[in-house]
Amino acid sequence: MCPLHNLDYEHYLPIFMDGLRCTDNPFKFIANQAVKELIDDARGNEQIITDTVDSLILPIRYALATKEPGTVLSVITILKQLCRVHPGVGPLLIPHYRQILGILNLFYCKSGKNLGDQMEYGLKPDDLVVEIAETLELLEKTGGDTAFAAIKFMVPTYTSAFAQL
């Protein structure tokens, strides 16, 4: 076994991030766990993450483009983890908000649907909306001064997390 910090993050992290859009198990599970563990292992050396942010945007965009609620939830969990690993990641994501937040806006505006007498099983849309709201707040808090304007441009119904203070 090779220690994770010895891996080439610029090579492996985008590959595993691209695997998030897989719907078949065990591939989806392996990709999800690999991304989480690689990001967790980089906590001591944040430069690794800041160097790979640009190469992660395309796999994130492709995964969000599937519009599968489970995949979207996995991606926003990873986005939150990326923002928490190092304060410098937030400002690096701002130029890419146009590619990422458009799909999140579709889910953010969908608070639920009328099913009549039927029941819906699985991930509830409201749960996904709450997770997206938390992600947008974290992106605003870690993104700096221009983050709110960039988020508001892509998600017009978003209200500032700082307005509640």
Each model region followed by its residue ranges:
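Conserved long hydrophobic alpha-helices within structured protein cores
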Residues: 29-30, 95-109
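Acidic, Ser/Thr- and Gly/Pro-rich intrinsically disordered linkers and low-complexity segments
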Residues: 108-128
